[in-house]
């Protein structure tokens, strides 16, 4: 049973993904791709703002992952703008919290200042979860600032036509030729 049950369940789920779920999802993705490729600049900026805000809403939670999965799905259709907006916006919360602990040291205790250093490094790697301790401690101030910052970042990214072909990597994707 230890070997058979996982094998059978993987087979059932895999076949369901291919034959039941795959075709409708492919159709939806094709429609979204067509819409993205034909939209004007204003709509692209709005999409960037929405995706950017989603990336910062729960910092690694389901809303964040939905935006990320959307961007990764578009990579297969060679639509690279949304992924750039998603990655740039996803880096906002940890970078903002890390910079805040350095700029306004007196507003943070020693443990938070150390957490800010870690958040800064995680932010450079596109790991949003570095900002969670700050958001958990003061959600009414941290979350709105991060969401607005992420939305602005996503909008700017789409407005300038930034493109990203890598699904992850943060600042380190700049090293890829």
How should each PLM-predicted stretch be described?
Residues 1-177:
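Pore-lining transmembrane helices
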